[in-house]
Curated annotation (Swiss-Prot):
Location of the protein in the cell: Cytoplasm
Protein name according to UniProt: S-adenosylmethionine synthase 1
Binding site for L-methionine: E58, Q101, D244, K275
Tissue: Mostly in Roots.
HAMAP family the record matches: S_AdoMet_synth1
Role of this protein: Catalyzes the formation of S-adenosylmethionine from methionine and ATP. The reaction comprises two steps that are both catalyzed by the same enzyme: formation of S-adenosylmethionine (AdoMet) and triphosphate, and subsequent hydrolysis of the triphosphate.
Family statement drawn from the similarity comment of this UniProt entry: Belongs to the AdoMet synthase family.
GO cellular component: cytoplasm
EC number per UniProt: 2.5.1.6
Name of the gene encoding the protein in the UniProt record: SAMS1
Predominant localisation class: cytoplasm
Binding residues for K(+): E45
Keyword Lipid biosynthesis: no
Annotated Mg(2+) binding sites: E11
């Protein structure tokens, strides 16, 4: 009988990837606005291309921020600060086409149709939260490793350890799964990184394997059959926005769960917390993570849907993929008893009117151990256990 080997793959990209540059600029603008006006409404979008950054979208605020300077500072911080990169902080043209938020949308959000004391959802739509006990940070191993590879290559570049590296990079990790869908081994690693013209491909591959990949991968999951693809296309000198255009919201799977869970389609960066695309997705992750950490299931996905101008969710669904340790009706009861999914309740519970967003715009919004994010807190575990 033929038995098909099962695999799962996730990817991540560096802070210097064109789409991530756009995300970071959008969230840097949002943070600057929130620092002056915590009640600002923001839906900022950014495009990046050869020598150009375009900023547009909607913003309603009493704050004044220098959008052009924020964009230039963000680009420089990422590492685009040398003329040979083509796209640089000092040479880029920044255009600002931000307009004020529609009054129709504003009035729908300011006072919910079903509860005037609450904020209405900023739009219709559904969001998903997910957690798995596969890793200590409750993310799929493939995504956790892909993010770590991107942070590691940033670190060796910024430290000057590999001074020929340039900011644009991508990583992808594939694992083999056993009959119980548990990770049995790492099957393949793909890592592509931009570099100077001076380095040979052989030298780059040797250095990246030794200083970037090997320190990150769990050695107990690596074997003689693990395949490494390091710059498999060969030369990668021209990169970043000089080679590819970038846009906010095009890395939503990298930002969330690496393909292990559903996605409602709404992106995060540039949006303030009245946008349930962002705030409710964060809260859904918070709920899922606390439920899994409390032991109700090995992995759990939560879907929440909203109507524009209405506070209470239209629907809430919980999926445990056959891993529940208690009755699923009990899980739903616990969730309803402990967690309030109305937008204003979410904003207040997670304290989301603060300038905390730029730090999330690269290397993932979830499972972060390098920064302190309120939706990653495990402060509801004891309450959940008491109700189990």
């Amino acid at each position: 009988m033929f038995i098909m080997t099962k695999y799962f793959t996730s990817e991540s990209v560096s802070a210097g990837h064109p789409d991530k540059i756009a995300d970071q600029i959008a969230d840097a603008i949002l943070d600057a606005v929130l620092a002056q006006d915590p009640y600002a409404r923001s839906a900022v979008e950014v495009t990046t291309s050869t020598g150009d950054v375009s900023i547009f979208g909607e913003l309603s605020t009493s704050a004044y921020v220098n959008v052009r300077q924020i964009a230039m500072d963000t680009i420089r911080e990422i590492g685009y600060n040398q003329a040979e990169l083509g796209f640089t902080a000092d040479s880029v043209n920044v255009s600002n086409r931000i307009v004020e938020q529609s009054g129709d949308i504003a009035q729908a959000v300011d006072s919910a149709d079903d509860d005037p004391e609450q904020l209405g959802a900023g739009d219709q739509g559904m969001v998903f939260g997910y957690a798995t006990n596969e890793t200590d940070n409750y993310l799929p191993l493939t995504l956790a490793l892909s993010h770590r590879l991107m942070r590691q290559i940033r670190d060796v570049r910024e430290a000057g350890t590999l001074n020929y590296l340039r900011p644009d990079a991508k990583a992808e990790v594939s694992v083999e799964l056993d009959d119980n869908n548990q990770v049995s081994r790492i099957a393949a690693v793909v890592l592509s990184t931009q570099h100077d013209e001076t380095v040979t491909l052989d030298q780059l591959r040797e250095d990246v394997r030794r200083l970037v990949i090997d320190p990150v991968l769990p050695q107990e999951l690596v074997d003689d059959e693990t395949i490494y693809y390091i710059n498999p296309s060969g030369r990668f000198v021209l990169g970043g926005p000089q080679a590819d255009s970038g846009l906010t919201g095009r890395k939503i799977i990298v930002d969330t769960y690496g393909g292990a869970a559903h996605h409602g389609g709404g992106a995060f960066s540039g949006k303030d917390a009245t946008k349930v695309d962002r705030s409710a997705a964060y809260f859904a992750r918070y709920v899922a993570k606390n439920l899994v950490a409390a032991g109700v299931a090995d992995k759990l996905e939560l879907q929440v849907a909203y109507a524009i101008g209405v506070a209470q969710p239209v629907s809430l669904n919980i999926e445990t993929f056959g891993t529940a340790k208690i009755d699923e009706d009990k899980i739903r009861d616990i969730t309803a008893q402990l967690f309030d999914f109305r937008p204003l309740a979410i904003i207040n519970h997670l304290d989301l009117r603060r300038p905390i967003y730029k730090q999330t715009a690269a290397f993932g919004h979830f499972g972060r151990t390098d920064i302190d994010l309120p939706w990653e807190a495990l402060d509801q575990v004891d309450k959940i256990k008491a109700l189990m």
